[in-house]
Curated annotation (Swiss-Prot):
Family: Belongs to the 4Fe4S bacterial-type ferredoxin family. RnfC subfamily.
Pfam families the UniProt entry points to: Complex1_51K, Fer4_7, RnfC_N, SLBB
Topology of the protein relative to the lipid bilayer: Peripheral membrane protein
Segments of skewed composition (Basic and acidic residues): 524-539
UniProt entry tagged with the keyword Chloroplast: no
Name this protein carries in UniProt: Ion-translocating oxidoreductase complex subunit C
EC number: 7.-.-.-
Protein source organism: Serratia proteamaculans (strain 568)
Disordered: region residues: 505-558, 653-674
Key words of the record: 4Fe-4S, Cell inner membrane, Cell membrane, Electron transport, Iron, Iron-sulfur, Membrane, Metal-binding, Repeat, Translocase, Transport
Cofactor(s) needed by this chain: [4Fe-4S] cluster
Residues reported in the UniProt entry to bind [4Fe-4S] cluster 2: 387, 416, 419, 422
Lineage, broadest ranks: Bacteria, Pseudomonadati, Pseudomonadota, Gammaproteobacteria, Enterobacterales
Limits of the 4Fe-4S ferredoxin-type domain: 368-397, 407-436
Record note on cofactor: Binds 2 [4Fe-4S] clusters per subunit.
Length: 703
C-alpha cells in the first residue's frame, strides 16, 4: 500500500489491453463557448431516464407546474423527474423516446408559459453542516443520475459506497470522438466541478481522490489546475488519449493499476467513480437547491452550420436543438444520439433530450458513410486485439448468431462494455455491437422468465405448505378438543342407543301385530268355507226331519248357548295370554294399543268355533221328538269344554310366565311383548284346535 501511494505521488499511470485510436473530430465544437438553447413549443419528459424503474406520477393533465417542480416521486433506484420550465401539463401519454428500439414510453407533455418561474428552492450555505444521509436524500430528490452515459442513480451508488471506499475517481476522460460536453463544462465551470467533488469527498471520506483527463484537452486541464489551487486531497492525472480510456474498468486500471474482477463493479476493489458532469449537478443540487433539469449537449457534425455545446433543458425535442444549430439535412441524412462508436441512430427527430444525452451528431454523407454491406467473418482476429475487456468478440459473434445463450454467457458476454472497438476494426463490416446487444436482451428476457417461473413455483409450494400447516393445526385442535368420556357420558350414550333401538323396533312390532289379524281373517274365511262344505255333506248323509217355525225358534237358544260357551272358553284362554304379555298396570297405554287387535282375533276365532259347534250340534242332535235329551247333554259338553279350556289356559299361562322377564325391568318387557305375544297367540291357537278335535272325538265315543 505504501508503494502504491508513492506511485500516486510520482504521477504514475498504467495502461490497459486493447483499445483503438480513431479520429477525434473534437475541434468542431470544443472551441465554441457554451450557449443556452431557447425554450421549445413543448417539452416531452419521459418518466424513466435512468437505470431503474420509473417513478409514480404526482401530477395530472391540466395542472400548472413551476420550474423545478417534481413530476414523479420514488425511492431507492427510482429517480424523480422535474418540470424544466413553468407551464401547463397538456398530456400524459406514451411517446417515442431516445432508445435504439424506438419504442414509446410514458411521457409528460408540458406547454411552457414563457415565464420560466422557479418553484421554491432550498439552497445550503454550508454543506458540511449536513449529515451524510441528508446529503444523499437531497441528491436523490434532485433526480441526479449518472451523466456519463450509464444513467445509474447517483444516490443509490453513493449509498452503496458509504463503507469501504478508498479511492474516489472523477472521470474527465471523455474519450469518444466528436463529444466535447465535459471538455467545455470543465473549461467554463471548473470551480463548480471541484466544489461538487469536495461534496463527494465530504460524503464518502475516501483516502485518495483522483481526476483522470485525457491529454487532448489542454484548456480543460489548465482550468482544473487553476481550480485545484488550495484544494488539498485532490490529484489531477493526465492520461494518454486512447479509446475507450473513459470506461470505468479501463480508467480504474489506468489510474491505480487494479483490474475489476469479472462480473463485478469498481466498488469491489474500493473504488467509486463519478462523471464530472455528475459532480457539477451535485454542486447545484446541494449548494443552489436546483434539481437536474438541464445539461450540456454537444451538437456537432458537418450537417450543422453552428456546431457547439448548448445548455439544453431535459425534454427538449432534438429537432428544436438541430434547428437552433443550423441543421442542413442532406440525402440519406442520419442523426446519431451519442458518439459514432457507442451511439445509435435516432428513429425520429422529435425524440426528447434526456439525462444521459451528451451528444447529437449530424454528419454529412462524406463524413460518415452509411453502413456498408455485412460480409462473412474471415477470422482475422483484429477484434480480439482491439477488445479492451479481454474478450473473444469473434466467438461471441458466432454464439449470438446461433442463439447459443449459455455459451455466450460462459464466454463473459456481459463483460462487454459495448465500446464498438471491435466493430471499428472489423474488415467485414460486421456490426458486432448490435449482435451483442441483441444477445444480451434475449438472455435477460430468458432470465426474467425463469425468475418469474421460480417465483410462481415458490408461491405454489408456499401455498401447499400453508395448507398442510392448517391441516395439522386443525387435527391438533381436534385432538385437544377430544376428551375422555366419563361415566355420565357413557350413560348418555347408552340411553341414546336405547332410543335408537326402540325406534327401530317400532316398525317391526307394527308389522307383526298388523299381520296377525290379516292372517287370522284369511284362516277364518278358509275355515268357514270348510265348515260349509262339511255341513253340506252332513245334510246329504243325515235325514233332516221337518222342523217347524217354533222348533227353529227353539233351536236358536241352544246354538246361542253353545256359541256363548265357546266364546267364554276363548275369552278365558285369551285372558291369561294377555296377562302374560301385557306390561304392568303402570303402563296402561300399551294394553290399550294391543286390545283392539286381540279382540278382533278372538272374535274371528269365536265365529269359526261357533260355526263348528253348530255343525257338530246339528250332526249329533236327535230328532225333534226328543229335545229334552239334547238339552240335557249340552251342559255336560259345555262343562267338559270349559274344563279343557281351563287346563290349556293354565299351561299357556305357565309357558308365558317362564319366558317373560322379571317385573323389575318393565322397559325390557315392553320391548319384547309384541313378539312374545305373537308366539303365544300362535301356540294358543294350536292348542285350542287340538282341544276342539279331542272334544269332538270324545263326544262321538260317548254317543
Amino acid at each position: 500500500m505504501l508503494n502504491l501511494f508513492a506511485a500516486f505521488k510520482k504521477d504514475r499511470i498504467w495502461d490497459f489491453d486493447g483499445g483503438i485510436h480513431p479520429p477525434e473530430m473534437k475541434t468542431q465544437s470544443s472551441g465554441v463557448p457554451l450557449r443556452t438553447a431557447p425554450l421549445p413549443d413543448k417539452f416531452i419528459i419521459p418518466l424513466q431516464q435512468h437505470l431503474g424503474p420509473e417513478g409514480e406520477l404526482c401530477v395530472k393533465v391540466g395542472d400548472t407546474v413551476l420550474k423545478g417542480q417534481p413530476l414523479t416521486v420514488g425511492r431507492g433506484r427510482t429517480v424523480p423527474v422535474h418540470a424544466p420550465t413553468s407551464g401547463t401539463i397538456s398530456a400524459i401519454t406514451p411517446h417515442i423516446t431516445a432508445h435504439p428500439s424506438g419504442l414509446a414510453e410514458l411521457c409528460v407533455i408540458i406547454q411552457p408559459d414563457g415565464e420560466d418561474r422557479w418553484c421554491e428552492r432550498a439552497p445550503v450555505a454550508d454543506y458540511r453542516q449536513l449529515t451524510a444521509s441528508e446529503l444523499i436524500q437531497r441528491i436523490h430528490q434532485a433526480g441526479i443520475a449518472g451523466l456519463g452515459g450509464a444513467g445509474f442513480p447517483t444516490a443509490s451508488k453513493l449509498q452503496g459506497g458509504m463503507n469501504g471506499v478508498e479511492t474516489l475517481i472523477l472521470n474527465a476522460a471523455e474519450c469518444e470522438p466528436y463529444i466535447t460536453a465535459d471538455d467545455r463544462l470543465m473549461q467554463e465551470h471548473a470551480d463548480q466541478v471541484i466544489e461538487g467533488t469536495q461534496i463527494l469527498r465530504h460524503l464518502l471520506q475516501p483516502k485518495v481522490t483522483l481526476i483522470g483527463i485525457e491529454d487532448n484537452k489542454p484548456e480543460a486541464i489548465a482550468a482544473l489546475k487553476l481550480a485545484l489551487r488550495g484544494q488539498p486531497g485532490i490529484a489531477l492525472r493526465v492520461i494518454p488519449t486512447k479509446y475507450p480510456s473513459g470506461g470505468a474498468k479501463q480508467l480504474t486500471k489506468i489510474l491505480i493499476g487494479k483490474e475489476v474482477p469479472h462480473g463485478k463493479h469498481s466498488s469491489a476493489i474500493g473504488v467509486l467513480m463519478q462523471n464530472v458532469g455528475t459532480a457539477f449537478a451535485i454542486k447545484r443540487a446541494i449548494v443552489d437547491g436546483e434539481p437536474l433539469i438541464e445539461r450540456v449537449v454537444t451538437l456537432t457534425g458537418e450537417a450543422l452550420s453552428l456546431p457547439g455545446n448548448l445548455w439544453a433543458r431535459i425534454g427538449t425535442p432534438v429537432q428544436h436543438l438541430l434547428k437552433f444549430a443550423g441543421f442542413q439535412p442532406q440525402a440519406q441524412q442520419m442523426v446519431v444520439m451519442g458518439g459514432p462508436l457507442m451511439g445509435f441512430t435516432l428513429p425520429a427527430l422529435h425524440v426528447p433530450i434526456v439525462k444521459i444525452s451528451n451528444c447529437i451528431l449530424a454528419p454529412s454523407v462524406s463524413e460518415m458513410a452509411p453502413q456498408e454491406q455485412e460480409q462473412s467473418c474471415i477470422r482475422c482476429g483484429l477484434c480480439v486485439d482491439a477488445c479492451p475487456a479481454g474478450l473473444l468478440p469473434q466467438q461471441l459473434y458466432w454464439f449470438s448468431r446461433g442463439e447459443e445463450h449459455e455459451k455466450a454467457r460462459n464466454h463473459n458476454l456481459f463483460d462487454c462494455i459495448e465500446c464498438g472497438a471491435c466493430a471499428f476494426v472489423c474488415p467485414s463490416n460486421i456490426p458486432l455491437v448490435q449482435y451483442y446487444r441483441q444477445e444480451k436482451a434475449e438472455i435477460k428476457a430468458i432470465d426474467l422468465e425463469a425468475a418469474r417461473t421460480a417465483e410462481a413455483k415458490a408461491r405454489y409450494e408456499a401455498k401447499l405448505a400453508r395448507l398442510e400447516r392448517e391441516k395439522l393445526a386443525r387435527e391438533e385442535r381436534h385432538k385437544k378438543a377430544a376428551v375422555k368420556l366419563t361415566d355420565g357420558d357413557q350413560d348418555a350414550v347408552q340411553a341414546a342407543l336405547a332410543r335408537v333401538r326402540s325406534k327401530n323396533a317400532v316398525p317391526a312390532t307394527g308389522t307383526i301385530s298388523g299381520d296377525a289379524p290379516d292372517n287370522s281373517e284369511m284362516n277364518a274365511a278358509r275355515e268357514a268355507r270348510k265348515a260349509q262344505a262339511r255341513e253340506r255333506r252332513a245334510q246329504q248323509e243325515t235325514p233332516v226331519a221337518p222342523v217347524t217355525a217354533s222348533a227353529s225358534e227353539d233351536e236358536d237358544p241352544r246354538k246361542a248357548a253353545v256359541a256363548a260357551a265357546l266364546a267364554r272358553v276363548k275369552a278365558k284362554k285369551a285372558a291369561p295370554q294377555a296377562t302374560a304379555v301385557e306390561t304392568p298396570a303402570e303402563s296402561p297405554a300399551v294394553v290399550t294399543e294391543e286390545d283392539p287387535r286381540k279382540a278382533a282375533v278372538a272374535a274371528a276365532l269365536a265365529r269359526v268355533k261357533a260355526k263348528k259347534a253348530a255343525q257338530q250340534a246339528t250332526a249329533v242332535e236327535t230328532p225333534a221328538e226328543s229335545p229334552a235329551v239334547v238339552t240335557e247333554e249340552d251342559p255336560r259338553k259345555a262343562a267338559v269344554a270349559a274344563a279343557l279350556a281351563r287346563v290349556k289356559a293354565k299351561k299357556a299361562a305357565q309357558q308365558a310366565t317362564a319366558v317373560e322377564t322379571p317385573a323389575e325391568s318393565p322397559a325390557v318387557v315392553t320391548e319384547e311383548d309384541p313378539r312374545k305375544a305373537a308366539v303365544a297367540a300362535a301356540i294358543a291357537r294350536a292348542k285350542a284346535k287340538r282341544a276342539a278335535q279331542s272334544l269332538t272325538t270324545a263326544d262321538t265315543d260317548k254317543e
